[in-house]
């Protein structure tokens, strides 16, 4: 009997890519597969997304994994390179890089490369995390233009801080700032990530960068992926390893924090915080088993979770429960725990088996 297993539906993944293309029909798609494709498996996900135009990752090791796995499409390093030595690796492996600070610019000017590298200049239009400040952007761009180690044309990218249709002022200002800077400059432009792809068509430029939406997950609170025509890609399952009679007044788990008010049956699932399921999940967090929702009770342990199956339960050892997936949205589970969906899906550990279906 397998323990915790993440079932990844590649057909749903490809559906989501097609749906995203419908939201941005004039843009190329840069599939964001950082953090092990948000916990879904970096290389297999990239291989399944054959219709993506580009891929992007956060770290150079992720990019090299894609190249060694046979991915030949352009790959962008979203945080850029971290050291001078990285530049030769990028050049040899034809990996494109974001440039967002003067230290990277100086490194590009100093290094000797047999061929130039492709860069995306990141400008800070309001996120205030990475990017060249607007008042420094013209001079920065000109130095890139003059640098023989930089392939031309230079592409330009930014990131929106808060896609909120009810308060669009900040987003609109960021878009205006971006458009003012890129006016008349050649090369590809990119603003929109998942949220802006779905709700902000005025931000769609040459390239859009779907991340969380690719995996069927809403980037917005109080909504699920299906609200936007997206399908969940991951279903996290685990088997019942015990079904126990439980008397009224008995506790369960560490510190006995939960006390049964009535006689019931408790089930024990083979999953815990050692698998990446949050220890902070409170009593009442939902689990799906045998066509119904049941609550977690007591503390999440390293390897196990207890659930209240009810006094009339007929569940058996070996029955599989869904922690999130088709029957129970990840967004709903995240809201119970107080996590974002981004955190929850990317926290799974290597102990969770991954199974791919088409």
Curated annotation (Swiss-Prot):
SUPFAM superfamilies assigned: Alanine racemase C-terminal domain-like (SSF50621), PLP-binding barrel (SSF51419)
Cellular component aspect of the GO annotation: cytosol
Sites where the protein binds substrate: 129, 302
Entry keyword annotation includes Transit peptide: no
Catalytic activity: L-alanine = D-alanine
Family listed: Belongs to the alanine racemase family.
Name assigned to this protein: Alanine racemase
Organism: Hamiltonella defensa subsp. Acyrthosiphon pisum (strain 5AT)
């Amino acid at each position: 009997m397998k323990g915790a297993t993440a079932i990844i539906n590649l057909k749903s993944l490809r559906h989501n890519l097609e749906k995203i293309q419908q939201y941005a029909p004039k843009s190329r798609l840069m599939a964001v597969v950082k953090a092990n494709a948000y916990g879904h498996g970096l290389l297999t996900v990239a291989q399944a997304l054959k219709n993506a135009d580009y891929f992007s990752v956060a770290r150079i090791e992720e990019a090299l994994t894609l190249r060694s796995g046979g991915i030949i499409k352009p790959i962008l390093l979203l945080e850029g390179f971290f050291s001078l030595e990285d530049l030769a690796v990028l050049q040899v492996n034809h990996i494109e890089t974001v440039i967002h600070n003067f230290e990277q610019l100086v490194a590009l000017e100093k290094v000797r490369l047999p061929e130039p590298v492709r860069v995306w200049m990141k400008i800070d239009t309001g996120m205030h995390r990475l990017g060249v400040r607007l008042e420094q952007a013209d001079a920065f761009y000109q130095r890139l233009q003059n640098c023989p180690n930089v392939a031309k044309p230079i592409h330009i990218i930014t990131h929106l801080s808060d896609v909120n249709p009810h308060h669009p002022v900040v987003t609109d200002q960021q878009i205006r700032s971006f458009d003012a800077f890129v006016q008349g400059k050649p090369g590809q432009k990119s603003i929109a990530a998942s949220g802006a792809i779905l709700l902000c068509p005025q931000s769609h430029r040459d390239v859009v960068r779907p991340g969380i939406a690719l995996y069927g997950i809403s980037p917005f609170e109080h909504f699920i992926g299906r609200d936007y025509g997206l399908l969940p890609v991951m279903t996290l399952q685990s088997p019942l390893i015990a079904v126990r009679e439980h008397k009224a007044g008995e506790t369960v788990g560490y510190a006995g924090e939960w006390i049964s008010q009535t006689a019931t049956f408790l089930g024990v699932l083979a999953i815990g915080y050692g698998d990446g399921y949050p220890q902070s999940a409170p009593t009442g967090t939902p689990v799906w088993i045998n066509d119904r929702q049941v609550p977690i009770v007591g503390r999440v342990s390293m390897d196990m979770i207890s659930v209240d199956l009810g006094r009339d339960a007929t569940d058996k050892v070996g029955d599989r429960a869904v922690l999130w997936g088709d029957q129970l949205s990840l967004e709903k589970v995240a809201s119970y725990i107080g996590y974002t969906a981004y955190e929850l899906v990317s926290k799974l550990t290597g102990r969770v088996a991954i199974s791919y279906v088409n």
